From Swiss-Prot:
Protein name: Nodulation protein T
Keyword tags: Cell membrane, Lipoprotein, Membrane, Nodulation, Palmitate, Plasmid, Signal, Transmembrane, Transmembrane beta strand
NCBIfam families cross-referenced by the UniProt entry: outer_NodT
Location of this chain's protein in the cell: Cell membrane
Lipidation (S-diacylglycerol cysteine): C18
Positions where lipid (N-palmitoyl cysteine) attaches: C18
InterPro entries referenced in this protein's UniProt entry, alphabetically: OMF (IPR050737), OMP_efflux (IPR003423), RND_efflux_OM_lipoprot_NodT (IPR010131)
GO MF term (any one): efflux transmembrane transporter activity
Length: 467
């Protein structure tokens, strides 16, 4: 065993500096200094910003906070972290010596009529085996690969959180939009029924023609026809919210129906600069970790082109007591290195290297594409949100004008100074404008969420040890 004591450090020293394959360096690419309609100041770490509180809607805030931990997609992503962590342990353990210990004890004997005497014997054996594979970096690169995959798993959790936040807010905004449309339709229905009754009274008095009564009733029926689909869409949105929170689809309809007005945010968004999204967006971080994983696999493939040495040895002491009570023992041992050298493989190992390099190139291109797409998403959301804000402000004024027009038309019709067509047109104009405003408020709120998601804001990452 003295030979083992001296040769193992020798081979370790021989191969410790022989790790093949490229050493990983994070990718870089030129980025614009600012977004086209943004500032030049970094927004820092926006991952912990609870930007949805700008809607000032306690119900929405509670749903987001509940779902970050309850959403099933998030829970699945968290569970995959355990798998990735186990793979790191496996990769690290593979680089260490394999030491096994075994032992046995046997009692044997003979008896019977054919034997003149009966006896038993006791035999004990044990074995201690050591095996250690030394190579050109397979285990080191495998460990690097597993660690990168673990980091990617953490990034996937953050991606799942952002996807949930976007889905829950979008579904909530939709539910409130349909709820608002229902309220508008019911108010319009009341107004049009009043007009219908007034027109019937005028017809009975001979002040208007039968055609006016038919037109007024037709408007009532068209309003009634809107309500069922609006109610169905509200319920569908409520079902989606419940599912996102890990609850049965129909369990939250009544709770959500008690909610308030359409969400309207009351805050500006500091989008920062393009360089910020590389740090803050988990999908970009995952793409970078995938690239690190692919780069490490090049080293794994290249290491298989070189020799590997396995150091192995064993000690197997055994002893026993025979039928006469005499004890004897034997201690065989063995040690020796084994060299494995690939010579002819038909080009398979070289092809593995080429394949690994190609996969790394694809990973880099995916990372670059992620960055460019992220910049585009921020630019698009920023422009769309700002323009939609102008639309909302204009529609609010248009609704005020339509309401005043309807008030004047109603008064004029009652006095007989204007026709029913003027009144019906005023009602229709107000209904259309109110619906347009509700749609614009819905879209504006969604764009606010889209912009915050695009800059990687709000997933509030937990320390790795806490997941």
């Amino acid at each position: 065993m003295r030979f083992t004591r001296y040769t193992t450090p020798f081979f370790s020293l021989l191969l410790s500096g022989c790790v093949v394959g490229p050493n990983y360096a994070p990718p870089e690419m030129p980025l614009p200094a600012k977004f086209s309609e943004g500032g030049v100041t970094s927004n820092g770490d926006v991952t912990v910003v609870a930007w949805w509180t700008a809607f000032n809607d306690p119900m929405l805030t509670s749903y987001v906070e509940q779902g970050i931990s309850q959403n099933l997609d998030v829970q699945q992503a968290i569970e995959r972290i355990d798998l990735a962590a186990a793979n790191v342990t496996i990769a690290e353990a593979s680089a260490l010596p394999d030491l096994t210990l075994s032992g046995s004890h046997t009692v044997s004997g003979q008896k019977g009529k054919l034997r003149k005497q009966t006896y038993t014997s006791n035999t004990s054996t044990g074995e201690l085996s050591l095996s250690w594979l030394l190579d050109f970096g397979v285990y080191k690169r495998n460990t690097e690969s597993a660690e990168a995959a673990l980091d990617a798993a953490y990034a996937s959790v953050d991606m799942a959180k952002l996807a949930f936040i976007n889905d829950i807010i979008s579904s909530y905004v939709d539910a409130r939009y349909y709820q608002r449309r229902l309220a508008l339709s019911q108010a319009n229905l009341k107004s049009r029924r009043e007009t219908f009754e007034l027109t019937k009274s005028k017809f009975a008095a001979g002040a208007v023609a039968r055609m006016d009564v038919v037109r007024a009733e037709g408007l009532v029926q068209s309003t009634l026809a809107e309500i069922p689909s609006l109610d169905a869409n509200f319920r569908i949105s409520a079902h989606r919210i419940a599912t996102l929170l890990g609850k049965p689809a129909g369990s939250m309809v009544e709770e959500i129906a008690k909610g308030s007005n359409q969400p309207a945010f009351r805050a500006d968004v500091n989008v920062g600069i393009p360089a910020d999204i590389i740090r803050n967006r988990p999908d970009i971080r995952k793409a970078e970790r995938d690239l690190a994983d692919s780069t490490a696999q090049i080293g794994v493939a290249e290491a298989k082109l070189f020799p590997s040495i396995t150091l192995s040895g064993s000690i197997s002491p055994s002893g026993g007591i025979n039928e006469r009570g005499v004890y004897g023992n034997l201690t065989p041992w063995s040690f020796g290195p084994k060299l494995k050298l690939p010579i002819l493989d038909g080009g398979g190992l070289r092809a593995d290297v080429d394949s690994a390099k190609s996969k790394a190139t694809v990973s880099y291109l995916k990372w670059k594409s992620r960055v460019l797409n992220a910049i585009e998403q921020v630019e698009n959301a920023l422009v769309a949100m700002q323009r939609e804000g102008r639309t909302v402000r204009a529609l609010k004024r248009e609704v005020e004008i339509a309401q005043e027009t309807l008030r004047l038309s109603t008064s004029s019709y009652k006095d007989g100074a204007s026709s029913l067509l003027d009144l019906l047109e005023a009602q229709r104009s107000l209904s259309v404008t109110q619906a347009s405003l509700a749609r614009a408020v819905q879209e504006w709120a969604k764009l606010y969420a889209v912009l915050n998601i695009a800059i990687g804001s709000g997933y509030n990452p937990v320390a790795k040890a806490g997941l």
